[in-house]
């Protein structure tokens, strides 16, 4: 029997990617997305569903939407995330995160058997927990049994430190177990490209600025905010706006001495001295120093691309630093290279690609949720 699916706040639809990976018989009867670049990406990957975008969720007439069995709603985290202004998600508040309540109409009218919610971990914090409880109560009144869990993608075969809260809801009396976390040997370095264009590498001016700012922070007792990580690690969270902050996703790679300028050589010496002095540890103020990770996991992929730096000194001396490429960020969201190529060939800018990756859901986490939900 074909599973009928509707994805709200779809993005490029990692939910469908997970269902594709399961090889489950499904049909996307509708999706809801207003961001023009996300729509372009979705159309590039799923052209067969191009005419099924119902647009703004607050304006959908659900009477005109075909019935569906699975409804997914990864509503905006803008007003919940610690990276945002935390305006909240009060019903009727007009905030982007408040769009959650627009999903009530779909659930009340269509009564799909399965629901899947995803959002940032902050939704479970004291400030926002009452809203989550209110939503949970609404679903219970509608006859759903609900199961909530915080999952980290690093525990599901993807080397990114990304915690998200998921709620699975099943109509009627039911039981659901989230898949147990498991260890993986996959490291950030396994997802990196071998040949990267020079434009991804930080300029000498930028590197010098980072050094000065690091030294200022260290004098204040805060440690370094500039925290590169080697490829034998887990990536930090992928954000939507890359390289806005020092503690972003950057990679340090080998550089032959004869390619270095005198200034860059001095930079290398300063960084090497920092390593030799053992100045690599996190501070209590969330200010971090240059610290090689040893766990093989990237930090979380976010919309601001600020946390992943890779380093690999040559002869313990020379290296250069670059940011993650858009393709590497998509890989850390567990998107296949085939689908990445479709996105990149659709004319979407690099900035928008970074944003898209940071806004999405890690495919393999969804895969294991669906695997348990549909018992495959």
Each language-model region and where it sits:
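SAM cofactor-binding core of SAM-dependent methyltransferases
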Residues: 3-58
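Glycine-rich, N-terminal phosphate-binding loop of Rossmann-like dinucleotide-binding domains
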Residues: 75
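FAD-binding beta-loop-beta segment adjacent to the flavin cofactor pocket
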Residues: 285, 320-347
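Class I S-adenosyl-L-methionine
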Residues: 60-70, 78-293, 299, 321-322
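Well-ordered alpha-helical segments embedded in enzymatic catalytic cores
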Residues: 14, 41, 99-102, 365
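Catalytic phosphate/metal-binding cores of nucleic-acid and nucleotide-processing enzymes, i.e., regions
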Residues: 350-351
């Amino acid at each position: 029997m074909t599973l009928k699916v509707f994805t709200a706040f779809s993005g490029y639809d990692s939910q469908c990617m997970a269902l594709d990976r399961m090889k489950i018989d499904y049909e996307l009867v509708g999706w809801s997305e207003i961001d023009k670049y996300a729509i372009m990406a979705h159309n590039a990957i799923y052209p067969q569903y191009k005419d099924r975008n119902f647009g703004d969720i607050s304006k959908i007439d659900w009477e005109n939407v075909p019935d569906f069995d699975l409804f997914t709603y990864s509503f905006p985290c803008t007003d919940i995330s610690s990276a945002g202004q935390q305006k909240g998600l009060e019903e009727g508040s007009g905030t982007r995160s408040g769009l959650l309540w627009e999903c009530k109409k779909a659930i009340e009218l269509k009564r799909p058997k399965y629901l899947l919610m995803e959002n940032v971990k902050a939704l479970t914090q004291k400030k926002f927990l009452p809203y989550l409880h209110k939503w949970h109560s609404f679903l219970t009144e509608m006859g759903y049994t609900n199961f909530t869990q915080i999952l980290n993608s690093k525990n599901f075969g993807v080397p990114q430190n990304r915690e998200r809260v998921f709620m699975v809801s099943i109509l009627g009396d039911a039981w659901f177990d989230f898949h147990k976390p498991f260890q993986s040997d996959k490291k950030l370095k396994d997802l990196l490209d071998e040949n990267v264009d020079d434009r991804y590498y930080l300029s000498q001016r930028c590197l010098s600025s980072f050094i000065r700012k690091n030294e200022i922070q260290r004098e204040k007792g805060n440690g370094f905010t500039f925290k590169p990580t080697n490829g034998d690690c887990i990536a930090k969270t992928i954000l939507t706006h890359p390289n806005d902050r020092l503690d972003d996703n950057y990679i340090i790679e080998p550089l032959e001495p004869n390619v270095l300028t005198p200034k860059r050589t001095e930079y290398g010496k300063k960084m090497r001295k920092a390593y030799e002095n053992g100045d690599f540890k996190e501070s209590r103020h969330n200010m971090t120093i240059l610290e090689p990770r040893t766990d093989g996991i990237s930090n979380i992929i976010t919309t601001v691309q600020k946390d992943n730096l890779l380093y690999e000194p040559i002869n313990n001396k020379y290296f250069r630093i670059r940011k993650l490429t858009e393709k590497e960020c998509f890989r850390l969201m567990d998107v296949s290279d085939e689908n990445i190529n479709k996105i990149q060939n659709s004319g979407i800018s690099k900035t928008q690609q970074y944003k898209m990756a940071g806004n999405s859901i890690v495919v393999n986490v969804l895969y294991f949720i669906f695997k348990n939900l549909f018992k495959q």
